[in-house]
Amino acid sequence: MTTTTPAVAVPTPTRKQRRASEAAESAHQKLSSPWASFAAVVIAVLWTIPTLGLFISSFRPEDEVKGSGWWTWFTNPSFTFSNYDAVLNGSDTDLATFFINSIVITLPSVVIPITLATMAAYAFAWMKFPGRDTLFVGVFAMQIVPIQVTMIPLLSLYVSPPFGLPSLAGSEAFGGGFYTIWLSHSIFALPLAIYLLHNFMKEIPTELVEAARVDGAGHVRIFARIMLPLMTPSIAALGIFQFLWVWNDLLVALVFGGGNLDVSPLTVRLAELSGTRGQDWHLLSAGAFVSLIIPLIVFLSLQRYFVRGLLAGSVKG
């Protein structure tokens, strides 16, 4: 007796899925071409040369740094750790306090905006409420405004009643504090973070969310059980960008820190290392590489999430 295996119906790809597949294949071919590889190598070399020069200068003696260019090291190599010793152990530098301040500033300035942006992006993407589209356009438009334009009005809000925050500002004569720097970085980061995370959420299949709703899941459960696991690469990529932005920031720390050395990050101290006339920039080169340690560790630790986050949602049908 012969048994017949029933044929399994294979779903036909939709037009949107076919366009997305064709676009992905076209992008793959372009990025894997010899010309694309050559361009990537050229850009990498051009990007690396200044960093290499700074690295070599950080190990050169002071008189050679001031007397000749870093490229002369290849014909007359000489090494010294005196620059790093002066930066790390010098009585006038004291980088340890500023290093800790940078960590204290950076961590909340990354966690706060990403947490708020993730929840706001879900609301814009999957919740219906009056004025949703208009409000989202307003959030998108906020990216156009340069942060330098908003600094003076924002600083006025911090210190002026009835909307001011005297407890955060410290006193009538604004002295700055960690809270004002955290809040400022969060405000500046939210528009772009909401926009990027919203676009990623919109790429999640509607069927997945509808199936969860059929099973009785509410918005909180859908957000926690479905969205967050799928968004891990995008959140990590955005977190790296925000971390690097805050860690390397000087302007926001100077303006909203109020010149208070107790809350000044490492970048403020690095700016002072070169001296009032830039005569000690050999110390600045060593201090710059000391400040690279934490960002380098963060990037290497989250590199795989960073690449996946950049590619997530990049091809739209």
Where are these regions (language model features)?
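A hydrophobic, multi-pass inner-membrane permease signature
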Residues: 2-317
